[in-house]
C-alpha cells in the first residue's frame, strides 16, 4: 500500500494506509486485527487498540534491542492455527496475561531487561499452537540458553522469535535455535536477525 500510494500520489494518511492494508488481512470470518500491519507501517514496537478506527500507540524501543527469527522447514496453515484457539480465556489466565502485557510496556519504557524477560509470556495462543511445532520447548530453551531475553512462537507459526540485547547476541541465538530444530529433524531453517528499527515501510531512492 505504501508503494501504491507513492505511485498514484494519493497522499493517504497513515490511518488510511492502515485501513487499506488491514483489508488484505481479513479472514473468512471477515474480522481483522492489524497486529502485523501496524508495526510494518509504523516501525518499531506498537500497541493497537481494536477500535473503529484502530488506535496505534508507538512504544519505545530500548537501545540495542534486536530480534532473531527462525523459520523451520515446516508449513502450517494460518487459518487452521487461528481455528484451534479457544473463544474464551479463563479469567485467571487472562488476568495474568494482562499483567504480563502491562509489565512489558513498563519494561520497554524503562529499558528494564529483567522485566522484559519476565513479561515475555504468551498465555493465550502459544499453549494451543506450540504442540504443532516439533521441538518447540527445546528450541526456545536453546534460545534462552544462548542469551535471549525471551523466545516464543511468531504469530501463527511455525516461525519462532527471540528478543535480544544486541544484534550480535541475536545472531548467536538464531544459530542455537536453528540447531535445536535440526536436532528434531528440521534441518536448514531460515534465520533472520535485525535490530528493531523505528522506521516503517517507506519509499527508498534507487541508486544513481
Where do the model's predicted regions map?
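Short, conserved active-site loops that position catalytic residues or coordinate cofactors/metal ions
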Residues: 36, 155-157
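Short beta-strand
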Residues: 150-154, 193
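Long, contiguous secondary-structure blocks with strong helical propensity
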Residues: 5, 145-148
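Phosphate-binding glycine-rich loop
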Residues: 10
